[in-house]
UniProtKB/Swiss-Prot annotation:
Its EC number is 4.3.2.10, 3.5.1.2. Residues 4-211 form the Glutamine amidotransferase type-1 domain. GO terms for molecular function: glutaminase activity; imidazoleglycerol-phosphate synthase activity; lyase activity. Pathway: Amino-acid biosynthesis; L-histidine biosynthesis; L-histidine from 5-phospho-alpha-D-ribose 1-diphosphate: step 5/9. The keyword Amino-acid biosynthesis applies. This is Imidazole glycerol phosphate synthase subunit HisH. The keyword Transmembrane helix does not apply. InterPro entries: Class_I_gatase-like, GATASE, Imidazole-glycPsynth_HisH. GO terms for cellular component: cytoplasm. It comes from the Bacteria. The active site is at 82 (nucleophile), 192, 194. IGPS catalyzes the conversion of PRFAR and glutamine to IGP, AICAR and glutamate. The HisH subunit catalyzes the hydrolysis of glutamine to glutamate and ammonia as part of the synthesis of IGP and AICAR. The resulting ammonia molecule is channeled to the active site of HisF. Heterodimer of HisH and HisF.
Amino acid sequence: MQPRVVILDYGSGNLRSAQRAVARVGAHATISSDPHTALEADGLVVPGVGAFAACMRGLRALRGDRVIGKRLAGGRPVLGICVGMQILFERGVENDVVTEGCAEWPGTVERLDAPVIPHMGWNTVDAPAESAMFAGIDKDTRFYFVHSYGVRTWEMQTTSPHLKPPLVTWSTHGTPFVAAVENGPLWATQFHPEKSGDAGAQLLANWVATL
């Protein structure tokens, strides 16, 4: 049976392209803004484009932040894409305005420190060797990015021997920034896997395989 995946419609993101990309790798993908439907799906994709603050307003308007929290509390997979990854952090800072995020991870989304903004186009990533997200993907593969803001410092410290620390993948545009995170049922990418060709399809297939 195909796993059921909901692409969360909260007024932001490349909904149709994400839906098509997830469907192509074997899931039954639908677009929905209904919190109950999003909560009950086998997998939830949280897309996002544009401003951090606008995305958080849209997400909170349909209680999407609570849906994400409830899913993760129950170990149910969530995949954040682009600003859908950024809003998983504690806060975003745009034009000196601070907006609270979902706070699944500590850290601040801020403007990239680079001579050319936005970061638009193809770039390589440095993924941990044990990454399940990047399984079957060559190390020098490029993914498609389009963003002006990102997480430049990973602040989460895990010292307990009983807790598995998140796997953090980095990329560089001017200075390093977080390109992807794997944290149990919560995966997220700053780049767009749905626009990243065969490599993006492999990544999405790896995620669907966890459902």
